[in-house]
Design a protein with these regions (language model features):
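Membrane-proximal intracellular helices of multi-pass ion channels
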Residues: 1-484
Length: 484
């Protein structure tokens, strides 16, 4: 049986949390005396007004959550946050279209970074801050944040954690899941604060520094500038952002060991992080070499532009410092391959994730060996441990579903009216939560020109991709809702 009362209670509590974040924007708008202040006040009141009856409906709820309940909470949390998160855009009139307002908000909470805005700098400070905050909240997950306070309801939170934690592994830092979530957010906040200070040291204004630090740590990519990081024209800022995108693509369990335990050997001996670094280095070297050959850039600039782009795309952050569509075609075509890779499991990034790619590569390698040595026993090992057959099956299923979703979305986008290249780019950018793509969704364009039908399909794909495919797809299965 689905524990609807507990779900209502959690949803109500989540809306109170969102109202708290919205109230920060009220203070900011009041400080700058800008016209978005009434929109934030109204949005906050509406959010609280809906949260109260939901909390009331959850009174005397049975204090337990099944795994099925966890999947419902996670998916509904993202949808609910996006529905109420779009209110400031819509009420203020800066994004007067419901489709566009919901698209911008879902792109924020899923940390996709795709935007329908053609003039970002026209937004007042409150909306710009809210836009960045949607990514910061979504980066580590609305639900992981809630796990830290779920003991208020007497719920341990493991079911929510299992549904939200990205990738096939997410090592628990401590035996208690609520303590784990608190440590994760401590590291998350620490990275954001440190980057803010370093960006300010590079003469980026305080407001811009905070916004970019939030969206970097979340690997989201929303910027306060239409031309993203390129607007600041600063090699120092580019290197700072590159470094923090790289760190944010690492498993947060490993960041805990690195920063709080000083376990350098264990961190840099991790199989996945070695794969992560190797793929980043490989693509950086290839694109740097390509730029040296095909462009007038020098070595330092070629390396800086290449490393920034590769790390931005592989961590699915989506910041840009150059219009790579102006580069040689083989170079910008590489971007579509990079977006598939993703960063580490247990990070804020989207995409397939390095651990899955690693396991798939080793499964394929073993198949070749098995042909030559039919009787050999060839386990797939990660960090010296054999990967369970169930994990291998899950990874293979993920790849299969991911590819099927790409082709289904690709075909549907072309039926909507997009051309071959644009349809593919929109689908992969949405599903992998990357943001910038190629063609009409390249770094020099917004997504505003897309038909509404394409935007809604992108919204669905952003949500599916952010919640690791199966979480959302399970809810679409009739068997999920059958009573047992």
């Amino acid at each position: 049986m689905i524990n609807w009362k507990m779900i209502y209670k959690i949803m109500g509590f989540l809306l109170f949390i969102e109202a708290g974040f919205l109230s920060l924007c009220i203070a900011l708008s009041a400080f700058y005396e800008e016209p978005d202040l009434p929109a934030f006040i109204i949005s906050t009141l509406i959010t609280i007004a809906v949260g109260i009856p939901l909390s009331y409906a959850g009174k005397q709820a049975e204090r337990k959550l099944s795994r099925k309940d966890g999947y419902i909470v996670v998916t509904f949390a993202w949808i609910l946050f996006s529905l109420f998160g779009m209110l400031p855009y819509f009420i203020s009139g800066y994004i007067p279209d419901i489709t566009n307002a919901f698209f911008e908000t879902m792109s924020g909470f899923t940390t996709t970074g795709a935007s329908i805005l053609d003039d970002i700098e026209a937004l007042p400070h409150g909306l710009l801050f809210w836009r960045s905050m949607t990514q910061w909240i979504g980066g580590m997950g609305i639900v992981i944040f809630t796990i830290a306070v779920l003991p208020i309801f007497g719920v341990g939170g493991i079911q929510l954690f299992a549904a939200e934690a990205t990738g096939p592994k997410f090592d628990k830092i401590t035996p208690r899941i609520d303590v784990t979530a608190k440590w994760i957010w401590t590291i998350y906040f620490g990275l954001t604060l440190t980057e803010t200070i370093l960006l300010m040291a590079g003469d980026m204004p305080l407001f811009d520094s905070i916004c970019h630090a939030m969206t970097t740590t979340a690997t989201g990519g929303f910027s306060t500038k239409q031309t993203s990081i390129a607007a600041f024209n600063s090699p120092y800022i580019e290197y700072v952002v590159t470094s923090f995108m790289f760190l944010s693509g690492i498993n947060f369990s490993l960041l805990y060991l690195l920063f709080l335990k000083g376990s350098f050997k264990r961190v840099f001996g991790d199989t996945e992080i070695r794969w992560y670094v190797k793929t980043l280095l490989f693509f950086t070297v290839v694109i740097t070499t390509g730029l040296l050959i095909t462009s007038p850039m020098g070595l330092e600039e070629s390396f800086r532009k290449a490393s920034f782009l590769v790390i931005s795309l592989q961590t699915t952050c989506g910041f840009i410092t150059a219009d790579y569509m102006l580069w040689a075609p083989p170079l910008w075509m590489l971007t579509t391959i990079i977006t598939y890779c993703g960063a580490c499991a247990g990070s804020t990034s989207g995409g397939i994730k390095c651990i899955r790619a690693l396991i798939m590569a080793r499964i394929a390698n073993n198949e070749f060996k098995q042909i030559l040595h039919p009787n050999a026993v060839l386990p797939v090992r990660v960090n010296g441990l054999s990967v369970a057959s169930t994990t291998k099956s899950t990874v293979l299923a993920f790849f299969t579903v991911f590819v099927l979703l790409v082709f289904a979305g690709w075909f549907t986008m072309m039926c909507i009216g997009l051309n071959f290249d644009d349809a593919y780019s929109v689908v992969i950018s949405s599903l992998a939560n990357v943001g910038p793509g190629i063609g009409m969704c390249g770094p020099a364009f917004s997504w505003n020109a897309l038909p509404d039908a394409a935007k809604w399909l992108s919204i669905v794909y952003m949500l599916i991709g952010r919640l690791e495919l199966f979480t959302v797809l399970l809810l679409l299965s009739p068997t999920f809702w059958k009573k047992r």
